[in-house]
Amino acid sequence: MALGDVRNDWTLEEIKDIMNQPFNDLMFQAQTVHRQHFNPNEIQTSTLVNIKSGGCAEDCAYCSQSARNQTEVEKEQMMEVQEVIEQAMAAKEKGATRLCMGAAWRNPTKKDFPRVLEMVRVVKDLGLETCLTLGMLNDDQVKQLKEAGLDYYNHNLDTSEAFYPKIITTRSYQDRLDTIDKVQEAGINVCSGGIIGMGEQHKDRAELIRTFGTMRHHPNSVPINLLVPVEGTPLAHMKDKTDSFEFIRVIATARIVMPQTYVRLSAGRMELTDEAQALCFLAGANSIFYGDKLLTTDNPEAGHDEQLFAKLGIQMQQNAKVEAAAKKLAEQTTELTA
């Protein structure tokens, strides 16, 4: 198959070879693939809202919201629908095309789930795409989310299956894969990514990308995060910054392996210089979280992003183009599995 074709049969060795090739060759290939499937001067923007903070039962070693970690994040009640409406309107006014709503849960509670469904409906009524990250889902919850009109569901794999037990013990890797399967089976777009800088090896990064690249349907979007060490978590000691070039290699490899997927710069952008971000965009990153907060983590201010986009000649993508790209990916993956 040619460079830029959608494949689901990637081997680990192929991906390691892509990631480890000379930097200029990697960047050229990634940009070539990117231009085959996307406008290289457009960025999709999402805003992330924390609809329920703290008190999560999971033991994710990086997370400030785990009840098992000794952080300063306090458990809060779930946000009211009206507050979500206000945040959605503000995000839309600033140019975001999607509102991602996150709750610190192992899985949604029966009591709170109806309010989540209402949030999906009201945000869609405002003309924004909707995304949720709520933890694991059962079949009935997936069905209800589909009926409510949910566009995307985020469920990150975080790292490779081999390294995963060093980061999380309360939920298995297979649990995460099963939730992704349920969401895809229901026809909801999947958003799933990972975190770089948790002590993993190069092979773990390659294996994570291979896992996504060999899924029956590639995720519609893959957020790539840089670890933000939080005091009170087991990874608070990980103070050595991941080399920017290593991070850019992950972005470029994800672009080549998943040609039609949105590759999103997520948490940790505060640690990247404008020049490093520009190289990420050149490597095929075409989505960011837009707004000064990502759950409990700081993010570049919207005004700074706008200035950077202006310097680079980048435009923020409009909803219709996002929908067209999602449809194209769905059609392509259907053909592959027919």
UniProtKB/Swiss-Prot annotation:
Cofactor binding: number and manner: Binds 1 [4Fe-4S] cluster. The cluster is coordinated with 3 cysteines and an exchangeable S-adenosyl-L-methionine. Binds 1 [2Fe-2S] cluster. The cluster is coordinated with 3 cysteines and 1 arginine.
Record field: catalytic activity: (4R,5S)-dethiobiotin + (sulfur carrier)-SH + 2 reduced [2Fe-2S]-[ferredoxin] + 2 S-adenosyl-L-methionine = (sulfur carrier)-H + biotin + 2 5'-deoxyadenosine + 2 L-methionine + 2 oxidized [2Fe-2S]-[ferredoxin]
Family matches, as InterPro entries: Aldolase_TIM (IPR013785), BATS_dom (IPR010722), Biotin_synth/BioAB (IPR002684), Biotin_synthase (IPR024177), Elp3/MiaA/NifB-like_rSAM (IPR006638), rSAM (IPR007197)
Residues engaged in binding [4Fe-4S] cluster: 56, 60, 63
Residues the entry annotates as binding [2Fe-2S] cluster: 100, 131, 191, 264
Pathway the protein acts in: Cofactor biosynthesis; biotin biosynthesis; biotin from 7,8-diaminononanoate: step 2/2
Cofactor(s) this protein requires: [4Fe-4S] cluster; [2Fe-2S] cluster
Zinc as UniProt keyword: no
GO MF term list: 2 iron, 2 sulfur cluster binding; 4 iron, 4 sulfur cluster binding; biotin synthase activity; iron ion binding
A Gene Ontology BP annotation from the UniProt entry: biotin biosynthetic process
Coiled-coil segments: none
Name of protein: Biotin synthase
Originating species: Hydrogenovibrio crunogenus (strain DSM 25203 / XCL-2) (Thiomicrospira crunogena)
